[in-house]
From Swiss-Prot:
It comes from Homo sapiens (Human). It is linked to BCL7B is located in the Williams-Beuren syndrome (WBS) critical region. WBS results from a hemizygous deletion of several genes on chromosome 7q11.23, thought to arise as a consequence of unequal crossing over between highly homologous low-copy repeat sequences flanking the deleted region. Haploinsufficiency of BCL7B may be the cause of certain cardiovascular and musculo-skeletal abnormalities observed in the disease. Residues 90-99 have a biased composition (Polar residues). Belongs to the BCL7 family. Residues 53-202 are annotated as: Disordered. GO terms for molecular function: actin binding. PANTHER family: B-CELL CLL_LYMPHOMA 7 PROTEIN FAMILY MEMBER B, BCL7 RELATED. GO terms for cellular component: chromatin; GBAF complex; nucleoplasm; SWI/SNF complex. Ubiquitous. Residues 107-123 have a biased composition (Low complexity). The gene is BCL7B. It holds the Pfam family BCL_N. Positive regulator of apoptosis. Plays a role in the Wnt signaling pathway, negatively regulating the expression of Wnt signaling components CTNNB1 and HMGA1. Involved in cell cycle progression, maintenance of the nuclear structure and stem cell differentiation. May play a role in lung tumor development or progression. Keywords: Allergen, Apoptosis, Differentiation, Phosphoprotein, Williams-Beuren syndrome, Wnt signaling pathway. This is B-cell CLL/lymphoma 7 protein family member B.
Amino acid sequence: MSGRSVRAETRSRAKDDIKKVMAAIEKVRKWEKKWVTVGDTSLRIFKWVPVTDSKEKEKSKSNSSAAREPNGFPSDASANSSLLLEFQDENSNQSSVSDVYQLKVDSSTNSSPSPQQSESLSPAHTSDFRTDDSQPPTLGQEILEEPSLPSSEVADEPPTLTKEEPVPLETQVVEEEEDSGAPPLKRFCVDQPTVPQTASES
């Protein structure tokens, strides 16, 4: 009997966890792919991370425009980490917890902001700026080639198709035979009854 109650408790906890995650996802409307360090290791993965809305950034910027931290970053970075903390749960996986830890470490240890980091915090430049270009992969990881367009344009714009003139099948087959340099392939016709007979004889 105790096994059933444990399973029921686990199911109810899982349902609660799902509700929390879904509520957090509802709050986050934008996601972007970033290179993220996993835990205390040097391993970096390319994964989706939540981005706060520009309205929320403007509100927090107007509230804390006079209150800047000594390292030059606005206190908006703490709002980002608190949003990610809401997204976390005690039973969540390790990499998402390390994301929050990495954000806190980045915002507290940088003494002078680079121009790229200051651009990423201002809401006016968020659409033009790509953070994955500023973070190269570490050893052992492949460099992924991406189109030069921002991710929002790539996702929204369907691929354009160009119409080519149809080439007759006979000329196409002749060109293939000439290009390959190999002897011509045997062609079987469905209309001829000799093909199944030769196959059955051998």
